[in-house]
């Protein structure tokens, strides 16, 4: 059951919408200045707005990812786990990945502080 404030869910929905629209400035406005963001296809993390901007610019020059949140789960730690349907195409439009992935967010004072890629709990 989701116990997160609606404002946090709306924050995350807005971040996904900005990412999918390639509106970097709108997405960065939803993050803390020292945000930690995973380099999902390369490993490690980038930190801060300029590193996130550079990473996304590089990523979008190589692949065309689209991410849609399908469910939000509150965790005991206060973080939010998002079940995300991720479709990644190459620049020619061919699908190279179509899967559900987990994104775990830490929110600080109404802004995204950390995002991690993680496994989703099994539905078994």
Protein language model annotation of sequence segments:
Residues 1-30, 123-124:
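Short, low-complexity N-terminal intrinsically disordered segments enriched in polar/charged residues
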Residues 1-3, 53-124:
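A beta-strand edge to alpha-helix "cap/lid" segment located at domain peripheries
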Residues 12-15, 26-28, 35, 48, ...:
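Hydrophobic pocket/interface hotspot
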Residues 22-25, 38-43, 91:
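Short, charged low-complexity linear motifs
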Residues 36-46, 58-62, 118:
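A short gly/proline-enriched turn/hairpin at secondary-structure junctions
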